[in-house]
């Protein structure tokens, strides 16, 4: 295989999106628009989040949680006793077969008395947490991080709205603390010696992968990752490497944005290369509320009309998550 070229992934200073300078916001929006119509990825810098602390706290959690604790937190795909845990909980590694492991948590406002929890509405779950005495401060940190990255995501959605010629709250009004289905996933890719062959996939072009090509199931995805190059995006010139940057957030659109904009902002197809290195991948999947519906539009059309049908976010999310598991396997 020849060398793989580097994808165009600009660094965009998103700090104006938190302020009131409309001209500065529009300049950011123009950069978001250009990136979204190119490779579909950009790095958000000057985002205001302490990512070094995020990385350190996540590392402490990953390195201290025991196999017994993981089992006690495992989602139902791994632990059949946990029938209410479809999304939230621990996703186990499988010795000799699957190396990656992760911990997923949802909206901290989904408490047992939340109306959606009471109604057993799909995709809504109460989070499960490890023992506070064994992981002091972890739950508090994780919940605070959810709201920190929620705030960043709200600002980014204003940038996307302006980029698409909409008023800045066009998306954000559907992204609310009381009902967002957004999730944080704390993914650990371990260094293993030997590394199990069964955990390595091979693409049609011969590239060894940890996770095969896919589009994200989200409106947008806000990703922090270690400074280890691993992601590739499909472009007209073939797959290209996305450079790692552990100071910024890697941003891309999910397939709900592609649906809404009639693929004006596509959901970039990307994949995870196999790299035998201890590293983190910590995505925040920006999801709207279960009943949220935004009418599709086409920015390229003079009247803005799209032939696509409106799709409730709850239906989109349920079907999208199942389809991704069916295609690429249980994460």
Curated annotation (Swiss-Prot):
Gene3D superfamilies reported in the protein's UniProt record: B-lactam Antibiotic, Isopenicillin N Synthase, Chain
Enzyme class: oxidoreductase
Record-annotated Fe2OG dioxygenase domain positions: 176-288
Keywords: Antibiotic biosynthesis, Cytoplasm, Iron, Metal-binding, Oxidoreductase, Vitamin C
Residue(s) at site: Transition state stabilizer: 211
PROSITE patterns for this protein: FE2OG_OXY (PS51471), IPNS_1 (PS00185), IPNS_2 (PS00186)
Residues that hold Fe(2+) according to the record: 214, 216, 270
Subunit structure: Monomer.
Function recorded in the entry: Isopenicillin N synthase; part of the gene cluster that mediates the biosynthesis of penicillin, the world's most important antibiotic. IpnA catalyzes the cyclization of the tripeptide N-[(5S)-5-amino-5-carboxypentanoyl]-L-cysteinyl-D-valine (LLD-ACV or ACV) to form isopenicillin N (IPN) that contains the beta-lactam nucleus. The penicillin biosynthesis occurs via 3 enzymatic steps, the first corresponding to the production of the tripeptide N-[(5S)-5-amino-5-carboxypentanoyl]-L-cysteinyl-D-valine (LLD-ACV or ACV) by the NRPS acvA.
Official protein name in the record: Isopenicillin N synthase
Organism: Emericella nidulans (strain FGSC A4 / ATCC 38163 / CBS 112.46 / NRRL 194 / M139)
Gene: ipnA
């Amino acid at each position: 295989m020849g060398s793989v070229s580097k994808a165009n992934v600009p660094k965009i200073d998103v700090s104006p999106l938190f302020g009131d300078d409309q001209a500065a916001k529009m300049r950011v929006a123009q950069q978001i628009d250009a990136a979204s119509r190119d490779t579909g990825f950009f790095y958000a810098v000057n985002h205001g989040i302490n990512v070094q602390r995020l990385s350190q706290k996540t590392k402490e959690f990953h390195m201290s949680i025991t196999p017994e604790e993981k089992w006690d937190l495992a989602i139902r795909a791994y632990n059949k006793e946990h029938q209410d845990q479809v999304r939230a909980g621990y996703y186990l590694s499988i010795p000799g077969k699957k190396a990656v492991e992760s911990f997923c948590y949802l909206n901290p406002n989904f408490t047992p008395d939340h109306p959606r929890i009471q109604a057993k509405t799909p995709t809504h779950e109460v989070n499960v947490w490890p023992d506070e005495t064994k992981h002091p401060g972890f739950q508090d940190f994780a919940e605070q991080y959810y709201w920190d990255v929620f705030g960043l995501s709200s600002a980014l959605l204003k940038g996307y709205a302006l980029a698409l010629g909409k008023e800045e709250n066009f998306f954000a009004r559907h992204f609310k603390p009381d009902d967002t289905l957004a999730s944080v996933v704390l993914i650990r890719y371990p260094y293993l010696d030997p590394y199990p062959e069964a955990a390595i996939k091979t693409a049609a072009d011969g590239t060894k992968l940890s996770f095969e090509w896919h589009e994200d199931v989200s409106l947008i995805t806000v990703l922090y990752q270690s400074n280890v190059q691993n992601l590739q995006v499909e472009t007209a010139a073939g797959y290209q490497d996305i450079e790692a940057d552990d100071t910024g957030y890697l941003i891309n659109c999910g397939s709900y944005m592609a649906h809404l904009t009639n693929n004006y902002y596509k959901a970039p197809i990307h994949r995870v290369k196999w790299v035998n290195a201890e590293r983190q991948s910590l995505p925040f999947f920006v999801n709207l509320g279960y009943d949220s519906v935004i009418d599709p539009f086409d920015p390229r059309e003079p009247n803005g009309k799209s032939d696509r049908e409106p799709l409730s976010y709850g239906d989109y999310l349920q079907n999208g998550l199942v389809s991704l598991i069916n295609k690429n396997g249980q994460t």
